C-alpha cells in the first residue's frame, strides 16, 4: 500500500471508526454504503479493507469510488478482490489524471470493476479489469494524455470542488 495513502488513513481512522460505532448504534444498523473521491477514495479503500478483515460485524452493501488513485500492489488488489462480497464500482471520468497515479511502472494497481464515463458524462462503459486495467477504458489515454484536472473535479455532471483547492 502506498505510504502516503496509509499515513492519511491512519491519521483519520480512529475518528472514523468511533463515529461509525456511534452512528450504527443510533440508527440500529450495521449496513454500509462506502464512497469517496480522490484521496478520500484511497482512504475509503483502506477502510473497506480493514472492515473486511477486522470488523465483520459491519455489512458492506455498496462501495463506490470516484477518481481513485491506485492504492496498492497486485497482492493487495488480489486480496481485496478475493474478500469482496458487495457491489463495488471504481468510477473514472474520461481523461481524469488521478486514476493514473501512482504509475503502474511502480507496481501500483487498481481494485477491480471500473466504470468509465465519456467526456460529457452521458455514456459509460463497464470495463473488463478483473486481471489488469482495461486499455479501452480510462487506461486508453495513458500515460501522456490523461492530464485533465477538470475531469477529476466533475463526476456525473456534479462539480466535486474547484481546481487548486
Regions of interest found by a model, annotated:
Residues 1-35, 39-165:
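Non-catalytic, mobile gating and regulatory segments of ester bond hydrolases
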